[in-house]
């Protein structure tokens, strides 16, 4: 489903990824393991379109993602939960979830059903639905970040340091 071939990514003159190739199969859990500085986050940012690959190919179900803007990559089904969570601190939990479905807002009834499903899946969020996300504990913010990402109905969920929090 996700095929990465000979990907090279740089931060200016610093070459961070050199010839990375891997595949992630549908229905399988794929983990990237390595020490700090190995390029795990850089690879996820490159897949998500936040960083641009200088060379190589990233395909989701045969469709090339390299060169696509991040919002288009999200539309294609790839969603990133970054290491630092990046919840909207001044917005309530419910609105954070709604933000995760921003590309699907044309069907508000379906989005509302998905919000309810996230409240069921992550019960701690229900009791905090009207509470600003910035007041949640680190673990609760991580839970919210994952739930918000799932609101986009991803085919691939990229999670950077998912147990941090």
How does the language model describe each region?
Residues 33-35:
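The feature captures the beta-strand-to-loop junction immediately N-terminal to the Walker
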Residues 48:
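Helix-to-loop junction immediately C-terminal to a conserved catalytic motif
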Residues 149-150:
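ABC ATPase C-loop
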